[in-house]
Amino acid sequence: LTKIKKLYYDGKKKALLISATGTGKTFLSAFAIKESNSRHILFIAHREQILLQAEKSYREILGKIDTGFLSGSEKNISADYVFATINMLAKDDIMRQFSPTHFEYIIIDETHRAGAKSYQKVISYFRPRFMLGMTATPERTDDFDIYKLFDNNIAYEIRLQEAMQENLLCPFHYFGIADIEVAGMIVDDNTHFSNLVSEQRVQHIIEQAGFYGYSGERLRGLVFCRTVDEAAELSHKFNERGFCTIALSGIDTQGSRNDAISRLEQPERQGGLDYIFSVDIFNEGVDIPAVNQIIMLRPTKSPIVFVQQLGRGLRKEKEKDYLVVLDFIGNYSNNFMIPIALFGDNSYNKDNMRRCISDGKNILYGPSTVNFDTIARKRIYEAIDKAHLNDVSLLKKAYEDLKNKLGKIPQINDFSYFGTIDIMRYWDKFGSYHAFLQKYEPNYNVALTGVQEEILQFICKRFARGKRIYEIELLQILLEGKEDIFTVLTAALAQQYHIGLPDTVKESVINNMTNVFTISNEREKYRHCVFIQQTDSKYVISDVFRACLKNKAFKNELIDVLAYARNNYQNNYYDTYAETDLCLYQKYTYEEVCWLLNWPHKINPNAMAGYFYEKNTRTIPVFINYIKADAKRVAYANKFLSDQRITAYSKLNRRIDSPDARHIYNADNENNRLFLFIRKPYEDKNTKEFYFLGDIHAIGRPVPAPRFNGFKIVYELMTPVREDIFDYLLS
């Protein structure tokens, strides 16, 4: 309210309020009007029912006010407070009965609809002193810029997850339930109508709804279906089984909808309703606080729609302690959107998505819970695995949403600051953010040379994820033009991060900064990526890099990349493990393991598979693809015996007396150090990242595995696997 008031008295003409369903947007707008001392008010919505609820709320806050409606049932243009449906107001003969300056204050509810011609017509005509737009979901699928419409003035923003933290909404218990097979076919995006309404499926839905129940004296539920016909037929079949339900669609009158809502809300079941079946007419703008159970029988096509439908039951009500949400999960291609919608994680990072599903109960704030049955969880994992999260259309959409919100081309740090898609998705797809902008942003006029683009992409690929700080800080020192660079680096590391620069690490940094670490087939591709050169007895900035930094645009882009890398390091990689540059439970590629263990050269991934002994550092990273045993490979599947022991197998064609076996079982005597890295093999097949689980040592000697033509060995982990990671790996 304070921010809206400030914008108003600062002379701003428009503002946008982004607030989750159920958090009191309408009440807030009434308080804002009261603060403004405005006399003539216009409240616009797309449905009459929203107007009726808004008018009631305004009377609660403002007392005895002169109100009237412009809708299909009433045409009052003389009231001080006019509540109008957009369809009625947009008619020329109605709108022009008001002068453009008649209303001092205009409220537009569900403002994400304002891209429509009817809204544009009304907004262009009126010239109020102040216009306030209200929505829970400003992002749109038609690329219309809602933020720009309101001059990019965001009065306040509180999304679903923040609203839950602030205890503004009713807690919910979400259950992801596997939809059943009908006639031997899993329900999916193309399931035939007859199977969607089959007796078998209806019985399954009823049984699950009864099992999970509701909070309150009686059941009051909303059921969201994929088609109008499905809603009607399911309602009919529920009624045949003793329920009192109705199906509503866009063809039903406002009076019919109001009557159905009243029957759902009434205290007595006699003459009331247990469920209302619909497709999308209750997605937004309708308050039914009494709803205590929501059933979702359609695929999650959009996180926005998911949150809208979930929000129908999140308004607090004294007769319910919580909302029950039942999501029947079929074999849908868009199942990967469920963790995005539920947890508000817009990073589009597959690992984050999987962790949300496996550890959802520990992620949501407060008493709300999320649970998936085994089959539903498996279907979501499969959808995540198949999802193309570097898809250009997805990246462009996420970019446009953020650009619209800011009213300018976003900088790299804006993506993390505003909690949108991870900037690394752009690096993975295009090599750099600059390359993406150059291709898809018409207002981006920055030009770099081929050498500068090569260097930028190398830094984004190798260092920008912030998995080690040494190279990041050294690049920053080079940018600042400082001399005696390793002396300056040593001081910076001690002062800012309280770490030293051991000789082994320094040598590794030099190898990285002179392109020695890179294997031969990549060396030509990044031949200009030499950042330092040796002059006499010390290292200085290379001639190539010095020349590149003369380009201000290149330098600024690099500053942004390094700022992101530094921030990511501090947030995710600062707490390193036992005299290494690795962090427990973070994920690393083969290349990153070579680099972070200070190996002189990168090793070909094919040679790394399984394990690899590096003689200079005496380190042996053990890489395990954790595959659940099946009938064909049960005898030779890697297997956790506990959270601190795992059975693993050697590479092919190895004997128990082979050198690699000796390096493993005789590690203590040889002063070798073994580390465990583990992944599920379906995870991001292109990157092949492994969770780091710390030091391990062999228990006893290897045992021959003749059918495998190798050996078996049991490892003990020095640190028991953290519970959520352990559960995820075994799930």
Regions found by a protein language model. Give the residues of each.
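Walker A/P-loop
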Residues: 10-33
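Conserved strand-helix element at the start of the C-terminal RecA-like helicase core
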Residues: 40-50, 194-241
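Conserved helicase ATPase core of P-loop NTP-dependent helicases/translocases
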Residues: 52, 69-70, 74-77, 94, ...
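Post-DEXD/H (motif II) to motif III coupling segment of the RecA-like Helicase ATP-binding lobe
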Residues: 113-173
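Conserved interdomain linker/interface between the two RecA-like ATPase lobes of SF2 helicase motors
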Residues: 154-222
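Long, largely alpha-helical accessory region at the distal end of helicase-like NTP-driven motors
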Residues: 215-216, 227, 342-474, 481-485, ...
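Conserved segment of the helicase C-terminal RecA-like domain
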Residues: 303-308, 312-342
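Acidic, glycine-rich low-complexity segments with interspersed aromatic residues
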Residues: 452, 456-462, 469-475, 582-689
